[in-house]
């Protein structure tokens, strides 16, 4: 199986609640490797560009405000089936519907404050990784 990369964001709610280490441990225990990582606070402009796909949705402004409300941890995860593995680890968008043991079931407060973001396809993964990282900032492990 070929190795692939995906983007993961630990959102402001999970950063504020000091879940960074526990979330990263779950990724590593699942066989995903961190190829790049940084902590940053998104500007509203950055958040609006990153989530532009949702601009016509009713939750868009709240999402932009939330994602720019505090620090986030942005990572490139690498491994076999990294995208699917990350999505499985995250669980359903709504933590009330997420399976027990998933990141959102364990660490999310609500559907809008749901702890983590993950790319949903190889196309979006490539775009999202390049949104946050230059190619020379990514280490292949």
Swiss-Prot record:
Pfam families: NDK. SMART domains: NDK. Keywords: ATP-binding, Cytoplasm, Kinase, Magnesium, Metal-binding, Nucleotide metabolism, Nucleotide-binding, Phosphoprotein, Transferase. ATP binds at residues 11, 59, 87, 93, 104, 114. Signal peptide: none annotated. The keyword S-adenosyl-L-methionine does not apply. NCBIfam families: PRK00668.1 (NF001908). Homotetramer. Major role in the synthesis of nucleoside triphosphates other than ATP. The ATP gamma phosphate is transferred to the NDP beta phosphate via a ping-pong mechanism, using a phosphorylated active-site intermediate. This is Nucleoside diphosphate kinase 1. It comes from Protochlamydia amoebophila (strain UWE25).
């Amino acid at each position: 199986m070929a190795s692939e990369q995906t983007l993961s964001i630990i959102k402001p709610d999970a950063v504020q609640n000091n879940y960074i280490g526990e979330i990263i441990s779950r990724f590593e225990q699942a066989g995903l490797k961190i190829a790049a990582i940084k902590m940053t606070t998104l500007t509203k402009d950055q958040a609006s560009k990153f989530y532009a796909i949702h601009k016509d949705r009713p939750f868009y402004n709240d999402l932009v405000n939330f994602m720019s409300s505090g620090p986030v941890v942005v990572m490139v995860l690498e491994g076999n089936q990294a995208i699917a593995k990350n999505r499985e680890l995250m669980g359903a968008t709504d933590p009330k519907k997420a399976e027990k043991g998933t990141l959102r079931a364990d660490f999310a407060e609500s559907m809008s404050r749901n702890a983590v973001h993950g790319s949903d396809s190889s196309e979006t993964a490539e775009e999202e990784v390049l949104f946050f990282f230059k190619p020379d900032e990514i280490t292949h492990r």
